[in-house]
Amino acid sequence: MLYLTKIRNAESEFTGNEQKIADFLRANVSELKSVSSRKMAKLLGISQSSIVKFAQKLGAQGFTELRMALIGEYSASREKTNATALHLHSSITSDDSLEVIARKLNREKELALEQTCALFDYARLQKIIEAISKAPFIQITGLGGSALVGRDLSFKLMKIGYRVACEADTHVQATVSQALKKGDVQIAISYSGSKKEIVLCAEAARKQGATVIAITSLTDSPLRRLAHFTLDTVSGETEWRSSSMSTRTAQNSVTDLLFVGLVQLNDVESLKMIERSSELTQRLK
Protein backbone atom coordinates (compact mmCIF):
# COMPACT_ATOMS: atom_id res chain seq x y z
CA MET A 1 0.00 0.00 0.00
CA LEU A 2 1.23 3.53 -0.78
CA TYR A 3 2.29 5.59 2.24
CA LEU A 4 0.07 8.56 1.35
CA THR A 5 -2.88 6.19 1.26
CA LYS A 6 -1.78 4.64 4.56
CA ILE A 7 -1.68 8.09 6.14
CA ARG A 8 -5.20 8.88 4.94
CA ASN A 9 -6.58 5.54 6.10
CA ALA A 10 -4.95 5.69 9.55
CA GLU A 11 -5.90 9.30 10.31
CA SER A 12 -8.60 8.39 12.83
CA GLU A 13 -5.99 6.51 14.90
CA PHE A 14 -3.39 9.30 15.04
CA THR A 15 -2.42 11.07 18.25
CA GLY A 16 -2.04 14.87 18.27
CA ASN A 17 1.65 14.74 17.36
CA GLU A 18 1.08 12.09 14.71
CA GLN A 19 -1.58 14.26 13.09
CA LYS A 20 0.90 17.16 13.02
CA ILE A 21 3.43 14.93 11.25
CA ALA A 22 0.83 13.64 8.78
CA ASP A 23 -0.36 17.16 7.93
CA PHE A 24 3.20 18.37 7.42
CA LEU A 25 4.17 15.45 5.16
CA ARG A 26 1.13 15.87 2.95
CA ALA A 27 1.48 19.65 2.69
CA ASN A 28 5.23 19.60 2.00
CA VAL A 29 5.71 16.35 0.07
CA SER A 30 7.34 18.19 -2.85
CA GLU A 31 10.02 19.68 -0.56
CA LEU A 32 10.91 16.58 1.48
CA LYS A 33 14.31 16.18 -0.21
CA SER A 34 15.65 19.02 1.94
CA VAL A 35 13.84 18.06 5.18
CA SER A 36 15.61 16.02 7.85
CA SER A 37 13.91 14.54 10.90
CA ARG A 38 15.78 17.08 13.05
CA LYS A 39 14.51 20.05 11.01
CA MET A 40 11.00 18.64 10.98
CA ALA A 41 11.05 18.06 14.75
CA LYS A 42 12.10 21.68 15.35
CA LEU A 43 9.46 22.92 12.95
CA LEU A 44 6.64 20.99 14.59
CA GLY A 45 7.84 21.35 18.17
CA ILE A 46 8.08 17.60 18.75
CA SER A 47 10.88 15.07 19.34
CA GLN A 48 12.80 13.30 16.57
CA SER A 49 11.85 9.97 18.11
CA SER A 50 8.16 10.81 17.54
CA ILE A 51 8.88 11.16 13.83
CA VAL A 52 10.79 7.87 13.69
CA LYS A 53 7.97 6.08 15.55
CA PHE A 54 5.43 7.56 13.15
CA ALA A 55 7.39 6.20 10.18
CA GLN A 56 7.60 2.77 11.82
CA LYS A 57 3.87 2.82 12.58
CA LEU A 58 3.28 3.13 8.83
CA GLY A 59 5.59 0.19 8.12
CA ALA A 60 8.83 1.99 7.23
CA GLN A 61 12.11 1.20 9.00
CA GLY A 62 12.67 4.86 9.74
CA PHE A 63 12.05 8.42 8.58
CA THR A 64 14.57 8.24 5.72
CA GLU A 65 12.75 5.30 4.14
CA LEU A 66 9.38 7.01 4.57
CA ARG A 67 10.70 10.28 3.15
CA MET A 68 12.18 8.65 0.05
CA ALA A 69 9.00 6.64 -0.54
CA LEU A 70 6.84 9.76 -0.30
CA ILE A 71 9.10 11.61 -2.74
CA GLY A 72 8.74 8.70 -5.18
CA GLU A 73 4.96 8.63 -4.76
CA TYR A 74 4.75 12.38 -5.33
CA SER A 75 6.79 12.16 -8.55
CA ALA A 76 4.66 9.29 -9.87
CA SER A 77 1.44 11.07 -8.92
CA ARG A 78 2.56 14.26 -10.62
CA GLU A 79 3.32 12.44 -13.87
CA LYS A 80 -0.09 10.76 -13.77
CA THR A 81 -1.90 14.02 -13.00
CA ASN A 82 -0.10 15.80 -15.84
CA ALA A 83 -1.81 13.44 -18.26
CA THR A 84 -5.34 13.91 -16.87
CA ALA A 85 -5.71 17.37 -15.30
CA LEU A 86 -4.00 20.74 -15.33
CA HIS A 87 -2.28 21.92 -12.17
CA LEU A 88 -3.65 25.36 -11.33
CA HIS A 89 -1.89 26.00 -8.03
CA SER A 90 -0.06 23.76 -5.57
CA SER A 91 -2.27 20.66 -5.06
CA ILE A 92 -5.25 22.26 -6.85
CA THR A 93 -6.11 20.87 -10.27
CA SER A 94 -8.59 21.69 -13.02
CA ASP A 95 -10.70 18.70 -11.89
CA ASP A 96 -11.37 20.16 -8.42
CA SER A 97 -14.74 21.69 -7.54
CA LEU A 98 -14.84 25.21 -6.05
CA GLU A 99 -15.69 23.65 -2.68
CA VAL A 100 -12.58 21.44 -2.82
CA ILE A 101 -10.45 24.39 -3.97
CA ALA A 102 -11.71 26.48 -1.03
CA ARG A 103 -10.84 23.71 1.45
CA LYS A 104 -7.38 23.17 -0.06
CA LEU A 105 -6.55 26.88 -0.06
CA ASN A 106 -7.78 27.29 3.50
CA ARG A 107 -5.75 24.34 4.77
CA GLU A 108 -2.66 25.49 2.87
CA LYS A 109 -2.82 28.89 4.55
CA GLU A 110 -3.56 27.38 7.97
CA LEU A 111 -0.51 25.13 7.71
CA ALA A 112 1.70 28.02 6.61
CA LEU A 113 0.64 30.00 9.69
CA GLU A 114 0.93 27.08 12.12
CA GLN A 115 4.36 26.00 10.90
CA THR A 116 5.74 29.54 10.70
CA CYS A 117 4.56 30.34 14.24
CA ALA A 118 6.10 27.08 15.50
CA LEU A 119 9.51 28.31 14.31
CA PHE A 120 9.55 31.62 16.18
CA ASP A 121 12.53 32.12 18.48
CA TYR A 122 10.99 34.77 20.71
CA ALA A 123 14.25 35.86 22.35
CA ARG A 124 15.72 36.51 18.90
CA LEU A 125 12.49 38.20 17.81
CA GLN A 126 12.74 40.60 20.75
CA LYS A 127 16.30 41.55 19.71
CA ILE A 128 15.08 42.18 16.16
CA ILE A 129 12.25 44.41 17.38
CA GLU A 130 14.69 46.38 19.55
CA ALA A 131 17.11 46.81 16.62
CA ILE A 132 14.31 48.12 14.41
CA SER A 133 13.02 50.43 17.15
CA LYS A 134 16.45 52.08 17.50
CA ALA A 135 17.14 52.40 13.77
CA PRO A 136 17.36 55.99 12.44
CA PHE A 137 16.35 54.64 9.02
CA ILE A 138 14.79 51.40 7.76
CA GLN A 139 14.95 49.98 4.24
CA ILE A 140 12.63 47.17 3.15
CA THR A 141 13.48 45.15 0.03
CA GLY A 142 11.54 42.49 -1.86
CA LEU A 143 10.39 41.40 -5.31
CA GLY A 144 6.97 40.33 -6.60
CA GLY A 145 4.67 39.08 -3.83
CA SER A 146 7.39 39.76 -1.24
CA ALA A 147 7.45 43.40 -2.35
CA LEU A 148 3.72 43.65 -1.58
CA VAL A 149 4.36 42.30 1.92
CA GLY A 150 7.20 44.81 2.32
CA ARG A 151 5.04 47.70 1.14
CA ASP A 152 2.35 46.79 3.67
CA LEU A 153 4.94 46.70 6.47
CA SER A 154 6.40 50.05 5.38
CA PHE A 155 2.97 51.72 5.61
CA LYS A 156 2.45 50.29 9.10
CA LEU A 157 5.88 51.45 10.31
CA MET A 158 5.48 54.95 8.86
CA LYS A 159 2.13 55.22 10.64
CA ILE A 160 3.92 54.90 14.01
CA GLY A 161 6.71 57.33 13.17
CA TYR A 162 9.52 55.31 11.57
CA ARG A 163 11.50 56.60 8.59
CA VAL A 164 11.16 53.87 5.97
CA ALA A 165 12.08 53.38 2.31
CA CYS A 166 10.38 50.61 0.35
CA GLU A 167 10.86 51.06 -3.39
CA ALA A 168 9.68 48.62 -6.06
CA ASP A 169 12.40 49.65 -8.53
CA THR A 170 15.43 47.39 -8.00
CA HIS A 171 17.88 50.10 -9.08
CA VAL A 172 16.47 52.41 -6.41
CA GLN A 173 16.65 49.58 -3.85
CA ALA A 174 20.36 49.16 -4.64
CA THR A 175 20.97 52.92 -4.47
CA VAL A 176 19.31 53.18 -1.05
CA SER A 177 21.25 50.13 0.22
CA GLN A 178 24.65 51.67 -0.46
CA ALA A 179 23.66 54.82 1.45
CA LEU A 180 22.70 53.03 4.69
CA LYS A 181 24.75 53.68 7.81
CA LYS A 182 25.66 51.85 11.00
CA GLY A 183 22.52 51.58 13.13
CA ASP A 184 20.22 51.55 10.13
CA VAL A 185 18.23 48.39 9.39
CA GLN A 186 17.49 46.60 6.14
CA ILE A 187 14.58 44.13 6.17
CA ALA A 188 15.01 41.81 3.18
CA ILE A 189 11.97 39.71 2.26
CA SER A 190 12.61 36.74 -0.03
CA TYR A 191 11.25 33.22 0.43
CA SER A 192 13.95 31.66 -1.77
CA GLY A 193 16.71 33.89 -0.40
CA SER A 194 18.46 33.66 -3.75
CA LYS A 195 17.10 36.57 -5.83
CA LYS A 196 20.21 38.36 -7.04
CA GLU A 197 18.68 41.84 -6.62
CA ILE A 198 17.83 41.20 -2.95
CA VAL A 199 21.18 39.54 -2.26
CA LEU A 200 23.04 42.46 -3.88
CA CYS A 201 21.17 44.95 -1.68
CA ALA A 202 21.90 42.88 1.45
CA GLU A 203 25.60 42.76 0.56
CA ALA A 204 25.66 46.54 0.11
CA ALA A 205 23.78 47.16 3.38
CA ARG A 206 26.07 44.87 5.34
CA LYS A 207 29.15 46.52 3.84
CA GLN A 208 27.84 49.90 5.08
CA GLY A 209 27.45 48.56 8.62
CA ALA A 210 23.65 48.32 8.60
CA THR A 211 21.85 45.45 10.34
CA VAL A 212 20.33 43.01 7.82
CA ILE A 213 17.17 41.15 8.85
CA ALA A 214 16.00 38.44 6.44
CA ILE A 215 12.44 37.12 6.28
CA THR A 216 13.07 33.91 4.37
CA SER A 217 12.60 30.14 4.24
CA LEU A 218 14.54 27.52 6.19
CA THR A 219 16.54 26.61 3.08
CA ASP A 220 20.22 27.57 3.10
CA SER A 221 20.63 30.56 0.77
CA PRO A 222 22.93 33.53 0.03
CA LEU A 223 20.53 35.89 1.82
CA ARG A 224 20.34 33.66 4.89
CA ARG A 225 24.14 33.61 5.12
CA LEU A 226 24.38 37.40 4.78
CA ALA A 227 21.74 38.29 7.38
CA HIS A 228 22.54 39.23 10.96
CA PHE A 229 19.09 37.95 11.95
CA THR A 230 16.64 35.63 10.19
CA LEU A 231 12.90 35.25 10.65
CA ASP A 232 11.91 31.88 9.19
CA THR A 233 8.76 31.31 7.17
CA VAL A 234 7.25 28.03 6.00
CA SER A 235 5.00 27.53 3.00
CA GLY A 236 3.53 24.28 1.71
CA GLU A 237 3.47 25.56 -1.85
CA THR A 238 5.07 23.41 -4.51
CA GLU A 239 6.54 24.30 -7.88
CA TRP A 240 2.93 24.03 -9.14
CA ARG A 241 1.82 27.48 -8.07
CA SER A 242 0.09 30.29 -9.91
CA SER A 243 0.82 32.79 -7.13
CA SER A 244 2.71 32.89 -3.82
CA MET A 245 -0.46 32.60 -1.74
CA SER A 246 0.57 30.73 1.40
CA THR A 247 4.07 32.22 1.18
CA ARG A 248 2.53 35.69 1.46
CA THR A 249 0.34 34.50 4.33
CA ALA A 250 3.42 33.29 6.24
CA GLN A 251 5.38 36.46 5.49
CA ASN A 252 2.47 38.67 6.58
CA SER A 253 2.23 36.81 9.89
CA VAL A 254 5.89 37.70 10.55
CA THR A 255 5.61 41.36 9.52
CA ASP A 256 2.38 41.83 11.50
CA LEU A 257 4.10 40.40 14.58
CA LEU A 258 7.00 42.84 14.10
CA PHE A 259 4.56 45.75 13.83
CA VAL A 260 2.57 44.81 16.94
CA GLY A 261 5.83 44.23 18.84
CA LEU A 262 7.00 47.73 17.91
CA VAL A 263 3.66 49.26 18.91
CA GLN A 264 3.92 47.48 22.27
CA LEU A 265 7.45 48.79 22.80
CA ASN A 266 6.23 52.39 22.67
CA ASP A 267 2.53 51.83 23.20
CA VAL A 268 1.28 55.26 24.33
CA GLU A 269 2.98 57.29 21.60
CA SER A 270 2.31 54.66 18.91
CA LEU A 271 -1.39 54.53 19.72
CA LYS A 272 -1.58 58.35 19.59
CA MET A 273 -0.09 58.32 16.08
CA ILE A 274 -2.42 55.52 14.95
CA GLU A 275 -5.38 57.53 16.26
CA ARG A 276 -4.20 60.70 14.49
CA SER A 277 -3.80 58.75 11.24
CA SER A 278 -7.32 57.40 11.59
CA GLU A 279 -8.74 60.87 12.25
CA LEU A 280 -7.01 62.31 9.18
CA THR A 281 -8.17 59.53 6.86
CA GLN A 282 -11.73 59.88 8.19
CA ARG A 283 -11.68 63.53 7.05
CA LEU A 284 -10.98 62.36 3.49
CA LYS A 285 -14.31 60.50 3.26
UniProtKB/Swiss-Prot annotation:
DNA-binding region location: 37-56
Protein's UniProt keywords contain DNA-binding: yes
Pathway annotation: Amino-sugar metabolism; N-acetylmuramate degradation [regulation]
Keyword DNA-binding included in the entry's annotation: yes
Residue ranges of every copy of the SIS domain listed in the record: 128-268
Xref: InterPro entries: Homeodomain-like_sf, HTH_RpiR, RpiR-like, RpiR-like_SIS, SIS_dom, SIS_dom_sf, Tscrpt_reg_HTH_MurR, WH-like_DNA-bd_sf
Cited PROSITE patterns: HTH_RPIR (PS51071), SIS (PS51464)
A Pfam match: HTH_6
Keywords: Carbohydrate metabolism, DNA-binding, Repressor, Transcription, Transcription regulation
GO aspect biological process, one term: carbohydrate derivative metabolic process
Any one GO molecular-function label of the UniProt entry: DNA-binding transcription factor activity
Domain HTH rpiR-type, residue spans: 1-77
Quaternary organization: Homotetramer.
HAMAP family: HTH_type_MurR
Task of the protein: Represses the expression of the murPQ operon involved in the uptake and degradation of N-acetylmuramic acid (MurNAc). Binds to two adjacent inverted repeats within the operator region. MurNAc 6-phosphate, the substrate of MurQ, is the specific inducer that weakens binding of MurR to the operator.
Protein name: HTH-type transcriptional regulator MurR
Organism: Escherichia coli O17:K52:H18 (strain UMN026 / ExPEC)
Gene this protein is translated from: murR
